[in-house]
């Protein structure tokens, strides 16, 4: 980890609970990131906060540190075995990631965490919750399900965290969030924290209805795309697009890269060509079953896979270390998605490379993206005659356990036969 992205604020100088302080030290964290340096002095006093910073800047450790500190400071016995902290995130992958990031604090403090997310693991999640937990980390839908069944009560909540808050609002979870917050003690009786890469005025206005005189802190990047990311743009014809991608992969030979496309079908096509060419590649789209999604992310993180082809489902909130390259096979329709996509590289002080294709179909999105990020993306030329000519016959996706939609279709067919 490079020190260039850290502040001068030492964790040891913060008024942290001694157990949390020791865990932070043993983890090797000495200096705070800017968002941690600004937010922790506020939250450690028990004051609500809305924090805005780019992904990969330490938001998760900021709110986890404050959460564990707050629960230990209260020092009350959780005889109810009901959660005392509620951490909400927009996706199940982010829920799992937050839980993984919290492991070192769990081991140090003895506080117990439980997960609540849809897609799989219902009984497994229930068993953990039934044994009693201190911190519940989940998506809104599954948490509401448990609350309505009487499995979970939120009367004892002392800390609430909304991570990627703007994304939750954008996805239409505002009604769910309001429902859960109203089940918690009033804002004056709890600590509430919001953290996100982007936090619009609309989101803050809505969220502040459920907060107690919050302070707003912002870490403004030098540029929206991050100054450690080298951006490059090509104008390929539709015919050259796949050949250009495969040629660049051979030339760049990235240690670990993510290729983004706008549609599931295009992602499957890219995966098919790269798989046939011998790349260690995974496919992450909305149709991939939850168990497979988590397995793919683990394989990509531990280096079993070198390439991940993804839709924007993977573009927000997921911390995957050491991503060297991001390819925008399609320029996204949403300008913010461009920033979030290339933000997968150049994280935590490291450098990264972003390569985008302004093809015949999606070049129309380029002016709005460049206006949004505040600069033109440097253009590179390519020699069509130098591109890989003999593309392999692409592998086809085998529909089955890999595809949640096909499982649903088979279930429907069985029900029709039964009834």
From Swiss-Prot:
Residues 40-217 form the Helicase ATP-binding domain. Transmembrane segments: none annotated. A motif (DEAD box) lies at residues 163-166. Its EC number is 3.6.4.13. DEAD-box RNA helicase involved in RNA degradation. Has RNA-dependent ATPase activity and unwinds double-stranded RNA. Component of the RNA degradosome, which is a multiprotein complex involved in RNA processing and mRNA degradation. This is ATP-dependent RNA helicase RhlB. It comes from Histophilus somni (strain 2336). The gene is rhlB.
């Amino acid at each position: 980890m490079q020190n260039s992205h850290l502040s001068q604020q030492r964790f040891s100088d913060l008024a942290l609970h001694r157990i949390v302080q020791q865990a932070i030290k043993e983890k090797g964290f000495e200096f705070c990131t800017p968002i941690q340096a600004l937010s922790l002095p506020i939250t450690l006093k028990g004051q609500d906060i809305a924090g805005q910073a780019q992904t990969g800047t330490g938001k998760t450790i900021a709110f986890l540190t404050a959460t564990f500190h707050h629960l230990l400071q209260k020092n009350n016995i959780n005889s109810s075995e009901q959660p005392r902290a509620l951490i909400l995130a927009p996706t199940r992958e982010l829920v799992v990631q937050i839980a993984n990031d919290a492991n070192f604090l769990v081991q140090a403090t003895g506080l117990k965490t439980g997960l609540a997310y849809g897609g799989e693991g219902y009984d497994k999640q229930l068993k953990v919750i039934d044994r009693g937990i201190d911190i519940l980390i989940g998506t809104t839908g599954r948490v509401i399900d448990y609350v309505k069944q009487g499995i979970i009560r939120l009367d004892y909540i002392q800390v609430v965290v909304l991570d990627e808050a703007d994304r939750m609002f954008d996805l239409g979870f505002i009604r769910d969030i309001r429902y859960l917050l109203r089940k918690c003690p009033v804002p004056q009786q709890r600590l509430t924290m919001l953290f996100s890469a982007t936090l619009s005025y609309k989101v803050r206005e809505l969220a502040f209805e459920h907060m107690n005189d919050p302070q707003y802190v912002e870490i403004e990047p030098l540029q929206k795309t991050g100054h450690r990311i080298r951006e490059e743009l090509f104008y390929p014809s539709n015919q050259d697009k796949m050949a250009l991608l495969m040629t660049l992969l051979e030339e760049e030979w990235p240690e670990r890269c993510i290729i983004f496309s706008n549609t599931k079908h295009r992602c499957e096509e890219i995966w098919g060509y790269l798989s046939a060419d011998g790349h260690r590649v995974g496919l992450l789209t909305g149709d991939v079953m939850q168990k497979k999604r988590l397995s793919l992310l683990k394989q990509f993180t531990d280096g079993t896979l070198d390439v991940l082809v993804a839709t924007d489902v993977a573009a927000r909130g997921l911390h995957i270390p050491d991503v060297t390259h991001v390819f925008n096979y399609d320029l996204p329709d949403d300008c913010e998605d461009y920033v979030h996509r290339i933000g997968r590289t150049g994280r935590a002080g490291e450098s990264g490379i972003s390569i985008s294709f302004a093809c015949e179909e999606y070049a129309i999105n380029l002016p709005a993206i460049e206006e949004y990020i505040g600069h033109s993306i440097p253009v590179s030329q390519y020699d069509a005659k130098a591109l890989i000519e003999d593309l392999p016959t692409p592998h086809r996706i085998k529909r089955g356990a890999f595809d949640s939609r096909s499982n649903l279709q088979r279930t429907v067919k069985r029900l029709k036969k039964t009834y």
